[in-house]
Amino acid sequence: MVGRLSLQDVPELVDTKKKGDGVLDSPDSGLPPSPSPSHWGLAATAGGGGERAPVAGTLEPDAAVTPIVPNPASLTHSLAAICSPRLCPLSFGEGVEFDPLPPKEIKYTSSVKYDSERHFIDDVQMPLGLVVASCSQTVTCIPNCTWRNYKAEVRFEPRPKPARFLSTTIVYPKYPKTVYTTTLDYNCHKKLRRFLSSVELEATEFLGSDGLADEC
């Protein structure tokens, strides 16, 4: 006697597949034993996306065994954002190159110290017969930034002594003084030379110029 399988019983076969494959192999089902998985069960699995939806309140086997390991790069970025160091200048050095080289040693050093008072120290060494004609330097520092700008220029001329020295005195009317003195010290061949310029003022009266006399 040959059994007949109707398509109306397909949902029931899918439900029995979820409960267990042993139900189809029982003698009461009237079907021969099936050594391979049911065709209807495979079709139902393929139509459902190939994966079984997890039940609420349960974990997958892989998720329950494997712990969640954070990304080291994300931890480093978060720690760097929290503990970002504040950049402050500590020391500064520079060198000056001379071309052509002088017959004797010439050194020019400059250093910057940053503290509560902010000192700037310059030290110039030169052979005999050379004097500093001009020296200009600019230091630009931006707080909390690694960018620094520094420009220095030194000019030497082979002059043993100053040829000319000019001193200008500006008298401010509100604070009158009688004597203004400017002193220039020059060291040549380790001999101290001093140049002194003095301006002496005397109170005078201008006839017919009362307004000018009041301003002076």
Swiss-Prot record:
UniProt-listed Pfam families: FAM101
Keywords: Cytoplasm, Cytoskeleton, Phosphoprotein
Chain intervals for the UniProt region annotation (Disordered): 1-55
The organism's place on the tree of life at top rank: Eukaryota
PTM-bearing positions, type Phosphoserine: S6, S26
Gene Ontology BP annotations: actin cytoskeleton organization; actin filament bundle organization; epithelial to mesenchymal transition; negative regulation of bone mineralization involved in bone maturation; negative regulation of chondrocyte development; skeletal system morphogenesis
Transmembrane segments: none
A single cellular component GO annotation: actin cytoskeleton
Tissue: Detected in various tissues, with highest expression in lung, followed by spleen.
Keyword Cytoplasm: yes
Protein's cellular compartments: Cytoplasm, Cytoskeleton
Main location: cytoplasm
Keyword tRNA processing: no
Role summary: Involved in the regulation of the perinuclear actin network and nuclear shape through interaction with filamins. Plays an essential role in the formation of cartilaginous skeletal elements.
Protein name: Refilin-B
Organism: Mus musculus (Mouse)
